[in-house]
């Protein structure tokens, strides 16, 4: 109701062969599912994770443990020793600590940043276009030597190369806007933390072309200076505080979740205009020497709506993972050419994914067909009215009936993954529809005297049946029972007190049964009731 949260799940992860395109959606709203997935294809192990669960560092640590345990089980007969990767005495609490809250300082003064609109790559792919993944490798040693020759880090060198690769696709008019990259920063390197939850910030190096100094060396020098000025502890703390201050705001904290989601989406849309592309360096992945002999490389890439370059290295192999949903791959081509000009030998890996498994949109197709049928029924009824009986407007009732059916089916489709939430929404919609039909047919009061109380009782019975059939735990059904019971008590009670209801029996029965359901939850499921109320409202 007010915020997103993570909760423990009894679901067991199942390892299976890769069956869908890389970086497919893991989080489906209202669907109870894990936020990570482990698959394999030939000699490759895949670990995909939803970003709300962890960041690149946390995902890397999990993958290291996963690979280590797999190799140990596969080769222990050959004498492979079992080793510990995690630090000694590292507890679950250490790994689940919220480091953002730990290092948040409300007294730290905020630094105002001038927001600049960045150049945007315009060549978008088609709707539902598959994610384009291009993976390349090169020698860490060779690239590191070149970076040292310039007096910069590998990240700075690749950032400058990426900016220049994008610039090559820009026109003179487009040079009015700078090329700006978002570069995530692992805050654990600045603020000590063993948390495996998200703990990262970001910086936004860029370059304004068109000033006469547009060579690679000019861009590299500007990026180098930006990194030096913006990777300080003070600067990153200020950036971190800006974000956490919004979460900690006493008024915004209690804003409805739906309102927050809309504001966040609007803010994200505006923030997109400040960034051209993303470069993420996951740094070095280390494995024990005994295990390293069985590993060829580590690679990383992320789902994105723009162009993103992810980097990680293992031993002397640097893996570059480009992901994009744009039609053009010219930027990637330019980037590889720049690296070759710097003396790096770039090897483009052959795609080794299974046959494309496109998303299944059959459910959406059914809703589209039903929508067309509803519109067709309304149009046909209007034509019939005009041709056969101009003075009678049966089409109005047909339109109202179609709208009623379409609304209930559309909500049912959207909320299909959570039947109890579906029922809660249907309770609200059907109550409103009853009143509208009563008003539209000449108010007789049947909607409030009989309709609403009966709907309230029916929905509560349906919820009980769903919970029984699906063997739902109290944690899964509690909030929906409470919402339905409270709604079914308060609304009929208000209608009774205000004198709107003239036939009292259905409303009295509805209020009494709803009250008993609520009391039963409090008495017999007290612990679960308090836990859910605290989780949803931070009370109790």
Spans of model-derived segments:
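Short amphipathic alpha-helices and their capping loops
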Residues: 1-14, 82-134, 138
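Membrane-helix interface and helix-disruption motif detector
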Residues: 376-400, 415-421, 436-455, 472-476, ...
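Central hydrophobic cores of alpha-helical transmembrane segments
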Residues: 160, 223, 423-430, 478-489
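Short, highly charged, low-complexity non-transmembrane loops/tails of multi-pass membrane proteins
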Residues: 529-540
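Hydrophobic alpha-helical membrane segments
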Residues: 455-466, 476-497
């Amino acid at each position: 109701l007010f915020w997103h949260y993570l909760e423990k799940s009894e679901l067991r992860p199942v390892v299976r062969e890769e069956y869908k395109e890389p970086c497919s959606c893991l989080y489906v709203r209202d669907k109870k599912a894990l936020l990570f997935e482990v698959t394999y294809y030939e000699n490759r192990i895949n670990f995909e994770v939803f970003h709300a669960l962890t960041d690149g560092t946390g995902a890397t640590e999990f993958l290291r443990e996963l690979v280590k345990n797999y190799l140990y089980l596969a080769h222990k007969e050959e004498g492979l020793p079992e080793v510990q990767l995690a630090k000694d005495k590292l507890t679950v609490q250490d790994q689940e600590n919220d480091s953002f809250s730990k290092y948040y300082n409300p007294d730290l003064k905020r630094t105002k940043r001038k927001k600049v609109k960045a150049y945007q790559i315009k060549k978008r792919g088609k709707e539902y276009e598959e994610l384009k993944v291009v993976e390349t490798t090169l020698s860490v040693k060779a690239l590191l030597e070149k970076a040292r020759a310039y007096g910069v880090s590998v990240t700075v060198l690749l950032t400058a190369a990426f900016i220049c690769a994008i610039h090559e696709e820009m026109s003179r008019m487009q040079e009015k806007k700078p090329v700006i990259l978002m570069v995530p920063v692992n805050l654990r390197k600045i603020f000590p933390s063993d948390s495996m939850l998200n703990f990262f910030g970001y910086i936004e190096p860029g370059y304004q072309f068109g000033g006469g100094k547009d060579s690679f060396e000019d861009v590299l020098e500007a990026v180098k200076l930006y990194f030096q000025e913006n990777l300080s502890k003070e600067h990153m703390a200020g950036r971190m505080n800006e974000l956490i201050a919004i979460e900690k705001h006493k008024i915004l904290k209690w804003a409805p979740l739906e309102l927050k989601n809309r504001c966040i989406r609007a803010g994200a849309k505006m923030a997109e205009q400040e960034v051209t592309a993303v470069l993420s360096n996951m740094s070095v992945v280390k494995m024990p020497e005994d295990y390293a002999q069985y590993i060829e490389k580590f690679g990383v890439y992320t789902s994105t709506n723009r162009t993103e370059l992810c980097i990680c290295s293992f031993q002397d192999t640097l893996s570059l993972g480009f992901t994009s949903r744009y039609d053009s791959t010219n930027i990637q081509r330019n980037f590889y050419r720049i690296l070759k000009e710097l003396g790096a030998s770039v090897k483009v890996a052959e795609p080794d994914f299974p046959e494309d498994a496109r998303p299944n949109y059959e459910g959406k197709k059914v809703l589209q067909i039903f929508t067309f049928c509803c519109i067709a029924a309304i149009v046909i009824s209007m034509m019939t009215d005009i041709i056969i009986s101009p003075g009678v407007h049966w089409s109005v009732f047909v339109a109202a009936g179609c709208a009623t059916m379409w609304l209930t089916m559309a909500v049912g489709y959207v909320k299909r993954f959570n039947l109890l939430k579906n029922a809660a929404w249907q309770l609200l919609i059907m109550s409103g529809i009853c009143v509208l039909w009563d008003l539209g047919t000449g108010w007789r009061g049947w909607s409030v005297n009989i309709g609403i109380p009966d709907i309230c009782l029916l929905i509560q019975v349906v919820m009980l049946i769903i919970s029984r059939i699906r063997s739902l735990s109290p944690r899964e059904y509690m909030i929906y029972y409470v919402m339905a019971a409270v709604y079914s008590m308060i609304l009929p009670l208000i209608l009774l007190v205000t004198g709107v209801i003239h036939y009292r029996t259905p409303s009295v029965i509805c209020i009494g049964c709803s009250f008993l359901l609520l009391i039963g939850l409090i008495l017999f499921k007290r612990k679960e009731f308090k836990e859910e109320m605290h989780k949803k409202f931070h009370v109790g």
